[in-house]
A protein has these predicted regions:
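Conserved short histidine dyad/triad with adjacent acidic residue
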Residues: 83-100, 113-124
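Short, Lys/Arg-enriched N-terminal segments with co-localized hydrophobic residues
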Residues: 12-34
Length: 186
């Protein structure tokens, strides 16, 4: 990590900057440049500093995430709420990508480390049709998939058009993870 709290990776000669939560909030709140990786078609559709997303960031900043009980925590009714969970990471091959239509996922690791695979929903092979009651569908993973490793205190903001596979082993062996997923109505 550099002095700005960024980790750098260079896939295919493209540098992606991943900010940890504290640094992202500091930079974004001052109006300084932050990097977002998205397709051109989807980038204009999202404002990553809307009032609802700001409520999600505030919840993550103002709470002791490690002390939160597992289950649902209401923030702003059905518009913004958090699901707290604990699990052991598994090999990526053991999971399917998931996607939502109604909510962004703001995923924050409270402790542990995990890899999250991400791919645009468009063009993915459906493994389970959309379940309207639970707002999710499952998809087969493309090869190769894009992934990011989340450490404690880091977030990934995943819009509805990005399928994602959280909970994957990040290093050599499974680890126990506690994570807060704030659901933000799109």
């Amino acid at each position: 990590m550099d002095k700005m709290g960024r980790c750098e990776s260079v896939p295919c000669c493209r540098v992606l900057l991943c900010y940890n939560f504290v640094t992202f909030k500091r930079i974004a709140s001052k109006g300084l440049d932050t990097m977002l990786v998205a397709s051109i078609e989807n980038a204009e559709a999202h404002d990553y500093l809307t009032e609802r997303l700001k409520k999600a960031y505030a919840f993550l900043r103002e709470n002791d995430l490690g002390a939160l009980s597992c289950g649902r925590h209401d923030i702003d009714g059905e518009d913004v709420f958090a699901n707290v969970m604990e699990y052991d990471t598994v090999p990526a091959e053991a999971k399917k990508l998931e996607a939502h239509k109604l909510y962004y996922d703001v995923q924050c690791v409270a402790f542990g480390i995990e890899r999250v695979e991400v791919a645009p929903v468009e063009g993915l092979a459906c493994a389970k049709e959309y379940d309207e009651a639970d707002d999710y569908a499952l998809f087969e993973s493309p090869m190769p998939a894009t992934s990011v490793v989340l450490h404690a205190g880091e977030i990934a903001v995943l819009p509805p058009e990005d399928a994602h596979k959280p909970g994957c082993i990040a290093e050599d062996a499974p680890v126990h993870v506690k994570k807060v997923v704030v659901k933000v109505r799109a």
